[in-house]
From Swiss-Prot:
This is Polycomb protein eed-B. Residues 40-57 have a biased composition (Polar residues). The keyword Cytoplasm does not apply. The keyword Aminoacyl-tRNA synthetase does not apply. Belongs to the WD repeat ESC family. The gene is eed-b. It comes from the Eukaryota. The lineage of its organism: Eukaryota, Metazoa, Chordata, Craniata, Vertebrata. WD repeats lie at residues 88-131, 139-182, 185-225, 231-270, 301-338, 356-396, 405-438. Residues 1-70 are annotated as: Disordered. Pfam families: WD40 (PF00400). Disulfide bonds: none annotated. PANTHER family: POLYCOMB PROTEIN (PTHR10253).
């Protein structure tokens, strides 16, 4: 982590409730308020996440696949539930993220999203969860699904990107307590946001409109659109950058996982040009790259909606609504990921993390900063934590966390950067704090 990134959360965040509306000096092409309404295509009508189309438990060939290999041993990590609270909107909380761009000794700050609300909290060492700020979107029909933290590379202020059913990305500065810019472009709901691991300005968004978009939030440019001819054929539900930020893996309702390289000459040039672009010095709009062809694609891992994907080194962790997170890699075991061709049809499944009662979609797992732990909640409020510090993924040990009053679907989890706190957010608008026992 660079010094600049470390500074971000150190600025004291004022505590207040804010209305979300954008400031006037955002790029009008991307942020025009007059465009806002054009994006709420069929989104206001159905803000809940519908049921999973088919129950995969009785899919052919599922029962014997990898059975018995994953009897989890006792995990070395243990957690204790120390606090919980409930947000007053009584709607599902779909997303939670700790701000990892903070220095040692800085307060542990996390954000939750659900309904038309974005809320920031601080975890106190004694177990308290303190409300810092709450933002409400001006549109009561907005339903935020996802959030992601970054920092301003000039001021080091923390920044929070949020998006949801209306397909509008909003960037919030918690220090000035303003929505400083917003981006309209996706033709439908946005299901996930991710910031590049090495460039705090490169934001990836994935959407119900079947496409991924890469934005430069410093120059307010749309760098590239991934989708089209060989792109996803249904909603994109999740995506992740690899550790170096050279590759993106995306997944969605079409049961597929697709690899997009962003370290190609074409993409490197596009990213550089997005930094050089200055609308004050030219009349021409920025030309976004249209990437129609992924660098690898497979439908051989899952038999249903793929709703969460993360890189683990050169391996992939992905899940569907089939009660298992699958660890796999493109190509054969010995193949180098950098040399995988788009025509590659092989995949190698290395193992599975099995759990139960998680067959609804849009349930997302998370890892800690050092990728030593993996956490996922199920639809009855049970949390699973796996120890990933094993040479063979088959030997991953699991611990199950339960608390009697936590009985609603856990939509997402997030670890604090030092892994001392695990937060889970639920469908009944509750937030649960688990502290790691050392």
């Amino acid at each position: 982590m660079s010094e600049a990134s470390g500074r971000a959360a150190g600025n004291e965040m004022p505590a207040k409730k804010q209305k979300l509306s954008s400031d006037e000096n955002s790029n009008p092409e991307l942020s025009g308020d007059e465009n806002d309404d054009s994006v709420s295509i069929e989104s206001g009508t159905n803000t809940e996440r519908p049921d999973t189309p088919t129950n995969a438990a009785n899919a052919p060939g599922r029962k014997g696949w990898g059975k018995g290999k994953w009897k989890s041993k006792k995990c070395k990590y243990s957690f204790k539930c120390v606090n919980s609270l409930k947000e007053d909107h009584n709607q599902p909380l779909f997303g939670v993220q700790f701000n990892w761009h903070s220095k040692e000794g800085d307060p542990l700050v996390f954000a939750t999203v659900g309904s038309n609300r974005v809320t920031l909290y601080e975890c106190h060492p004694q177990g308290d969860i303190r409300l810092l700020q709450s933002y409400v979107d001006a549109d009561a029909d907005e339903n935020f699904y996802t959030c992601a933290w970054t920092y301003d590379s000039n001021t080091s202020h923390p920044l929070l990107a949020v998006a949801g059913s209306r397909g509008i990305i909003r960037i919030i500065n918690p220090i000035t307590m303003q929505c400083i810019k917003h981006y309209v472009g996706h033709g439908n709901a946005i299901n996930e946001l991710k910031f590049h691991p090495r460039d705090p300005n490169l934001l990836l968004s994935v959407s119900k409109d079947h496409a991924l978009r890469l934005w430069n939030i410093q120059t307010d440019t749309l760098v590239a659109i991934f989708g089209g001819v060989e792109g996803h054929r249904d909603e994109v539900l999740s995506a992740d950058y690899d550790l170096l930020g050279e590759k993106i893996m995306s997944c969605g309702m079409d049961h597929s996982l697709k690899l997009w390289r962003i370290n190609s000459l074409r993409m490197k040039t596009a990213i550089k040009e997005s930094y050089d672009y200055n609308p004050n010095k030219t009349n021409r709009p920025f030309v976004s790259q249209k990437v129609h062809f992924p660098d690898f694609s497979t439908r051989d891992i899952h038999r249903n909606y793929v709703d969460c994907v993360r890189w683990l080194g050169d391996l992939i962790l992905s899940k569907s609504c089939e009660n298992a997170i699958v660890c796999w890699k493109p190509g054969k075991m010995e193949d180098d990921i950098e040399k995988i061709k788009a025509s590659e049809s092989n995949v190698t499944i290395l193992g599975r993390f099995d759990y139960s009662q998680c067959d609804i979609w849009y349930m997302r797992f998370s890892m800690d900063f050092w990728q030593k732990m993996l956490a996922l909640g199920n639809q009855v409020g049970k949390l699973y934590v796996w120890d990933l510090e094993v040479e063979d993924p088959h030997k991953a040990k699991c611990t199950t966390l339960t608390y009697p009053k936590c009985a609603s679907a856990i939509r997402q989890t997030s670890f604090s950067r030092d892994s001392s706190v695990l937060i889970a957010v639920c469908d009944d608008s509750t937030i649960w704090r688990w502290d790691r026992l050392r």
